[in-house]
Amino acid sequence: MGRGRVELKRIENKINRQVTFAKRRNGLLKKAYELSVLCDAEVALIIFSTRGKLYEFCSSSSMLKTLERYQKCSYGAVEVSRPSKELEQSSYREYLKLKSKFESLQRTQRNLLGEDLGPLNTKELEQLERQLETSLKQVRSTKTQFMLDQLSDLQNKEQVLVESNKALTRKLDEISVKNHLQLSWESGEQSMPYGHQQAQSQGFFQPLECNPTLQIGYNPAGSSQLSAPSNAQNVNGFIPGWML
C-alpha cells in the first residue's frame, strides 16, 4: 500500500517538527544540488530554522554574487521603470505649462494687433495701451539711432571723397604746370631764327687763327721796316733776297 497524503499544516509536536524539518531540509538541499548539476542552473537556497539557524546552498562560487544578480533582476527593472514614469509625468506637466504659455502669448499678440479686445476690462486695456506706447518709444528711438548712424557713415564717406578730390586736384595742377613748361620750351626752340642759332654755335666754337710766318725773336719795329721795302719791291716786281 502506498503512503497516504500528508495534510499540510503546522506540526504541533516539537520533536516530530524537528525531525520533519531535518528530513525535508536535507531533501531540499539534495534537490537543489541535483538541479544545478543536471540542468547547469545557478541555484541558491537559504533556510532559517525556527531558532534562527541558517542553512544555505549555492551552486556558484559566492552566495553574494548570486544575491546581487537576483537584486538586479528583481529590483533593477522596477527602479528603471519608475524613473521613466516620473519622467513621462514631468514631461507632460512641462508640455501643459508650455502650451498655456504659448496660448497666452498668442492672445497678447492678437491684442497688440487690435484683435480680440472685447473680453478685456478697463485695467487690461490701460495696460495694453502702456505696452503699445512703450513699444512705440522703443521703435522711434531705434529708428533715430539708425538714422544717426547712417548720417555719420555718410559724413565719413564725404570727408574721404573730399580728401581724394583735393589730392586729384593737386596732381592735375602739377601735370598742367609740367605740360605748360614743356610746351613753352618746345615753342621757344622752334621760333628761334637760324642766324641766331649759328651765331650762338660760333660763339661756342671759336677757330684758332694761324700765322704762316714763323716769328722767332719777333720784333714789331723791324718787321714794320722790312715790310715796307718788301712791299715796294713787290710792287716793282722784284723778289726780295731773303725769300729766295
Curated annotation (Swiss-Prot):
Residue stretches making up the K-box domain: 88-178
Molecular-function GO terms, alphabetical: DNA-binding transcription factor activity, RNA polymerase II-specific; protein dimerization activity; RNA polymerase II cis-regulatory region sequence-specific DNA binding
Location in or out of the cell: Nucleus
Source organism, top-level taxon: Eukaryota
Pfam families: K-box, SRF-TF
Alphabetical keyword list: DNA-binding, Flowering, Nucleus, Transcription, Transcription regulation
PANTHER family: SERUM RESPONSE FACTOR HOMOLOG
Role played: Probable transcription factor involved in flower development.
Protein name, as recorded: Agamous-like MADS-box protein MADS2
Origin organism lineage: Eukaryota, Viridiplantae, Streptophyta, Embryophyta, Tracheophyta
